[in-house]
Amino acid sequence: MKKLVLAWVFACGVALAQPAEGTVFYEVFLRSFGDSDGDGVGDLRGTTERLDYLQDLGVGGVWLMPLHRSPSYHGYDVTDYRSVNPDYGTMADFEAFARAAHERGMDVVIDLVVNHTSSAHPWFRQAEAGNAPRRAFYSFSDTDPGWQGLGGPAWHPSGRGYYLGLFWSEMPDLNYRNPAVLREMQDVARFWLARGVDGFRVDAVQHILESEGGIIANTPENIAWVGDFERFIKSVKPDAYLVGETWTDTETIVRYHRAGLDYSFNYPLFTALVGSVQDRNPGELERVLEQDLALYPPNARQATFTSNHDQIRPGTSLGFLRRDEARLKLAAGLLLTLPGTPFLYYGEELGLPNGPGDADEEKRTPMMWDGSANFGFTTGTPWYAFSSDDSTLTVAAQAEDPDSVLNWYKTLIALRNEYPALREGGLELLPGTPDTVLGFRREHEGQRLIVLANFAGEVQVDTAAYAGATELLTGRAVGETLTLGEMGMGVLELKPE
């Protein structure tokens, strides 16, 4: 099955920004993470109070979903880019959070929604009222150009004309062909970098500059814009970085890296990893890894993930009829032993499921901390229902269970933090393993690891070539064969050459 032996080196000979290669990040939806004042809504102080938990988990960075003023619960329609949503606290609360994170060795990344504003933003209200400079901040047309947006028409009626809003009418697109808009957003980035932000996750990164003919994603001008914005933030703070929401194919993602983007979310790898675990077959994951090996440039940093605020949680997607901890652990094991910079989504380390409905809110339900009232999230009425009433899923319960999903994540993150080969090493896909097993080598500065991941029932793997190695998850010596349980993994440290 395995014909290719390829090497993947993520960074060689190129000066890249912090954080350290392979650091594990953790995505937080403030509204759902920790409530400090009992109003049922998570906030910055509540999240600051939980930083010790994240430090114990082993993460090195925190990504905060939008924290600015916004009329929506999710915050992706901003009304003031230089503010903190009052639901979440004050600017002083944010600065205290950033200091506390940095004291624990964690980077702080915030969402930067550059593509569009809220229709309630003062800029847009002034534009609709006829203010010429503000009207030039957006794209207006006397007639409807007839473009298709993301889920509906891209142009929306306004007075005697139309304005562009790719996502929907209440998210009008900014016009970056106007230099004043670019200067404004550069100043916003400068504002947050001065307040302790280390990097920005750029939302809707593919859609910032459309073509005049109606191409709404990944135009050459758009890709160049992203590279220029990366260079701008580095001119302000040399170790700052962008993480692009590159929800597209591998060939297109590579174009962003060649333009200068530091980090890209690897959506094809996400789809292949979760799909292969669902299918109990490593074939598609292996195919995508081979593609990545062939296409990514050496300066590319891939943000890898199995979950985020837009996706069905693995606690649901990997166990539609019942909780399937074996699948959850295999997906986590792959994420944390493959190359890249893993981004976890809050509650993923517990295997939390989606809520019962189809709304996006069901992917963003409150965190379950302990068995007390409202699972320790709030002393008030939670802003949204919990995704489960099972107290065994909480942090407190899983911390006491050595075989829990939480402790599996902690084990793998600790292993990743201890072994540079897992964070920085190249990737070599191994031939000759059973069809249900994906094998790969990670190597860095003489440290050599072999990872064997089994996607189906119990199987024996020929490990004669690695006899005398140590299996790091159990501490046992490796003999002529290694038995992998159903959905099981082995991480072998080879003796120094």
Region locations from a protein language model:
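Core domains of carbohydrate- and sulfate-ester-processing enzymes
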Residues: 125-165, 272, 277-295, 364-388
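Loop/helix patches that line or flank the sugar-binding groove of alpha-linked glycan CAZymes
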Residues: 19-21, 233-236, 248, 255-258, ...
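Acidic/aromatic-lined carbohydrate-recognition and catalytic surfaces
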Residues: 18-186, 190, 194, 205-258, ...
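Solvent-exposed beta-hairpin/edge-strand motifs
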Residues: 465-475
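C-terminal beta-strand-rich structural cap/linker in extracellular carbohydrate-active enzymes
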Residues: 480-497
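Surface-exposed beta-strand/loop patches in extracellular or lumenal glycoproteins
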Residues: 455-467
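Positively charged n-region of N-terminal signal peptides that target proteins for export
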Residues: 1-4
